[in-house]
């Protein structure tokens, strides 16, 4: 039995992170939240009043305050910049609405991608994002591209925000998600698209358990072959 690398890509709020975390726990794999890394870079930029005109300064912040992952007492993942816990602040709407321009900076992507590739070398890892199967882990043994309707994704984000006590308006979320889709799929650097050998899975109307089961079955076939 071998440890494989699983890449899950897809648009915002398609359920990638939720599914990836469950599968990582079930398989005993490491979950590397790439979206959280870009959110962390965005958080650092916003905290320091930086824009796309300040690329060297953003890279300097990433060097001074490296991004790392840990676990809370209940096993849930935590995200740090330096020694500061930013697990919750990086889910703020201001960060969400600015992450696209930070993620589109080639030098920022290059720095974070090299960190991700180093971590994934040993296998036994699951990563989700926008370009894992195409750029970060083009040789991953299993690649999944998850899609879902804008309405369903807005509903998911709305429920998540309400549960976390974050104010939310459903129509605003629909508009923001549609705009994010356009930005992510039209950016010059690593646009959102499925890898040629990815399995595209429309999760509209499919339960989280159903999605997890589908991906785990695919993973186990590959693991058993090894």
Curated annotation (Swiss-Prot):
It is found in: Cytoplasm. One of its GO terms (cellular component) is cytosol. ATP binds at residues 10-18. One of its GO terms (biological process) is pyrimidine nucleotide metabolic process. It comes from the Bacteria. One of its GO terms (molecular function) is CMP kinase activity. InterPro entries: Cytidylate_kin, Cytidylate_kinase_dom, P-loop_NTPase. Its EC number is 2.7.4.25. Its main location: cytoplasm. It catalyses: CMP + ATP = CDP + ADP; dCMP + ATP = dCDP + ADP. It holds the Pfam family Cytidylate_kin. Gene3D superfamilies: P-loop containing nucleotide triphosphate hydrolases. Keywords: ATP-binding, Cytoplasm, Kinase, Nucleotide-binding, Transferase. Belongs to the cytidylate kinase family. Type 1 subfamily. This is Cytidylate kinase.
